[in-house]
């Protein structure tokens, strides 16, 4: 997952 753009998932929040 590319959290630099799609930071709206549980993976990026953790």
UniProtKB/Swiss-Prot annotation:
Venom peptide that completely reduces melanoma (IGR39) cell proliferation at 2 uM dose and reduces more than 90% for glioma (U87) cells. Also reduces melanoma and glioma cell migration and strongly inhibits angiogenesis. May act by binding to integrins. Negative results: has no toxicity on mice (ICV injection) and tumor cell lines. GO terms for molecular function: toxin activity. Transmembrane segments: none annotated. Keywords: Cell adhesion impairing toxin, Disulfide bond, Secreted, Toxin. Expressed by the venom gland. Belongs to the disintegrin-like family. Disulfide bonds join 3-12. This is RK1 peptide. One of its GO terms (cellular component) is extracellular region. It is found in: Secreted. Its main location: secreted. The keyword Secreted applies.
């Amino acid at each position: 997952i590319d959290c630099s753009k799609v930071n709206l998932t549980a993976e990026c929040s953790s």
